[in-house]
Amino acid sequence: MFEPTPKQFGVFWEFIENPTVTDIDYNGRELWITDLKKGKYKKNITLSDSFISTFTHNIANSVNGNLNKVNKILEADTKELRISVIHDSVATSGISICIRKSPCLIRNTIDEMIKEKYCPEMILQLLINCVRVNMNFVFGGEPGAGKTECAKFFMQFIRPEDRVITIEDSLEIHYREINPGADAVELKVGDGFTYTDAIKASLRQNPKWLMLSEARSTEVTSLLEQWSTGVHGFTTIHLDDLRKLPDRIQNMMNNVNDAARMENRIYRYVDVGILVKRHVDQNGQIHRKMDQV
């Protein structure tokens, strides 16, 4: 992890500093910006080959990495940025750059969620109370729907004395920053330390809550095992319909021989499922809401 500077990011910097910008995407030809207020739009800026080369070189140096025909993918994290670059030897349309912002704040507030019709006030209060009585949550949605932001909102209702362990490959939750004074441990997985390793190690750290940034594969088995011991938690998952959640989790589990037992475990330990969706209106504005609970 490194500290970003205007010199490193060049023309990207103005968008990084803009608090309403969430994503900066370059497809090899055009620069696309995703803004909370304006929606997604193309910026009329021409990025020279020289700038792109300098930018990728700066990022590679910051993480002691390389971007070339051998190392085709470059990934880097700062405290609030997740950067992904794909080399033009495989991105035939030109080098591809994605910068996603994950600020150390909770974007959603109760008043704004009600005003923007994110969900009915009655449902919102019910879900807040579900957190307070230690229920397990799974937040579903498609990429960019706002699953993590929704999870971060509900995390603020966890008691500060409850030890929370977050497990992420890219640090997006920022639990200690959004809940100052809370008992929290933040784990980052990577080479030699998998999600499953982190989940199993967490059991010896006296957690009350275990937060998995995203359930993608067989680590969901270990997560459910942890929840079965009385540890509570949140996770997010790619999903387009909440009714598919049990099958989606079951397909990721590494034990398919006893399907009935696995299905029973899912229904037993997943207390609350929330599907978050986003849509773009005719003016290009992005709107998010809880579509299913």
Label the predicted regions.
Residues 1-22, 63-70:
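Phosphate-interacting basic helix/loop segments used at nucleotide- and nucleic-acid interfaces
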Residues 32-133:
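P-loop NTP-binding catalytic core
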Residues 147:
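Conserved lysine of the Walker
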Residues 150, 154:
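Hydrophobic positions on the alpha1 helix immediately C-terminal to the Walker A/P-loop
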Residues 267-293:
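Conserved P-loop NTPase
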